[in-house]
């Protein structure tokens, strides 16, 4: 298979972004609303990992004598200093790259032109900040929750819940952006806040196990980062990130059950404060049947919206530029949650007249090569159910 890339406009069409604000307009908004943040460098920590285009470098020319007297001197340039760009510059570069990608298509071909089954087609280039990408993630979350808690599929058919007594916990983990009275760069903040996750994960798993719940069979999770935007809380941390962990448990749980998890984050993350992580602020638990639109309820916490990046709140755009510069993941899920979402997609494809899928999910079983599973369903390879 070969592929090539070209401008979606072909150089002739009108600009598809004409109805959207420009990158420069959004950057101006960021500078106007958050001037104290716009001129911050993304990080001042030596050794911080950043994509090269989000750094500035200074070079000096040098000249060294040749190895032998009659050899010409060696001349060149060497990097003598490198630092992160400012947050405002990162916003501009992220939005410019995004706008360029919106105008780009990827041309694909399969086989050779002389082959009877030769095919060629084009697809829109895409990044994780596209509304189409966000829409897929939202569909996966809906499918996951539908498999565990039950619900109606787009076809009108109903999925029976895999869990008998599903409860949903939302755990929020954050960190101060002014830990010592001085505002820190967003990439440094992102790294420090996320460093607690390994310890938090093990504490969560062990806490659930102590209550008789095993990961995968009795509970699953979906962890997502999102920015502080002002919809909840004050403006001190606006534009900086925090994490929401959506946990679905097959059994009754309450906020106090997750106290060790929150305490582990506060203990491990040096910028996490106890006040912001009191149980009434950091944990919310509901029985799934109490929430009319469960996926919408969870998605509202996780900032999953099929909205163009250029139209997102400026706080979201600023946060996106920071995680883009650091090239960090903003989503992680338990394997069982991925398998459940895949099972839902399999059911929907089997019901769709536009797909030629032969079997529904769970109609045919084959041996599984996945660790910890003996069998999986033939279509799409999901062991869920």
Language-model-detected regions and their locations in the chain:
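Right-hand nucleic-acid polymerase module
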Residues: 1-239, 251-385
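Short hydrophobic/aromatic beta-strand micro-patches
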Residues: 246-250
